[in-house]
Amino acid sequence: MAKWMLELPLQIALEVDGTKYLLAHAMTSSTYEVCSDEYYLRGDGDFQSFLNHGIEEYISICGHSNPEGNVIWRNYKGNVIICDCGCGFQSGRLGCLCIETGEEIYV
């Protein structure tokens, strides 16, 4: 299973209606090619800086960090969106985001 997981992409870049997105489990990074095996363990930067500034020219959509209130969170620049609403916890819920419309859906 570990071999299979290491073969998965770290992030996915896509463009919808002229807007560029990066999708990842916990944190996105610049779209340069990652060469280090260590990247899979540690990423490439400071998480707080990522939350504040994001990745230039992209909107990053991630999970992993449950925002306060179990709602989809956006940074002040609007280029980082955290969708983890704690659905694995008793007080959590599943948060979904429609990229085309920006609609937030909670289950």
Describe the residue ranges of each PLM region.
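Acidic, His/Gly-enriched loop-helix segments that form or flank divalent-metal centers
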Residues: 1-82, 86-92, 99-107
